[in-house]
Amino acid sequence: MDVTRYDPVWREAETYLRARKNDIHIPLSFAWCQKLLDLHPQADRDICSLAILLHDIGWHSVDQAKIIGEGFRSKNFLQSDVRYFHEKEGVRLGTQVLRATGWSDSVIDAVCEIIDGHDTRSAPHHLNDRIMRDSDKLWRYEVTGIAVACDWFGVTPHAYVDQVEAQLPKFETEHGRRLAEAEMADTRRKLMLHVL
């Protein structure tokens, strides 16, 4: 599939992607999404691709200090108020972006259903949701994801890789988990984590 069909959405969302290193996180997660979609041909490519592209744009509406303090370093950060707020803002901004780029109401509704609760909801709604969730996780196993996220969490790369290794059972698809395991092994090697 030619992913340039999503270029207008990227352009329309660009301003919102400049918060919280989403201009790094989202393109990497989008690439993982395309890999997962190739492995799950029954999933809806447009819905999954648009959902991963837009799922975190709501962070644009949150103060950077709150993002780090409450969104990553608080005791129960996955249930923090800023997590819920960024999901609601993601739905609002995502709707605007998709309308501005000509997507149908049915596509907008399906994408926003995934965005709303993507961090805070305990279980996915369906396969499209599972693929978006796994795509969102996979970038954390790359060297770049480790470099960015260990700063968010205020830990060393080794500590963060150990943290994401413990989260492997949370993958929603077997393919996602296998990709994460392979990427994590490569990251451990590249970052010399057997020493550092």
Label the predicted regions.
Residues 36, 60, 97:
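Short alpha-helical functional segments enriched in proximate histidine and acidic residues
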Residues 21, 45, 82, 86:
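Conserved acidic
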Residues 29-30, 84-100:
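An active-site-proximal "capping" alpha-helix that borders the catalytic cofactor pocket
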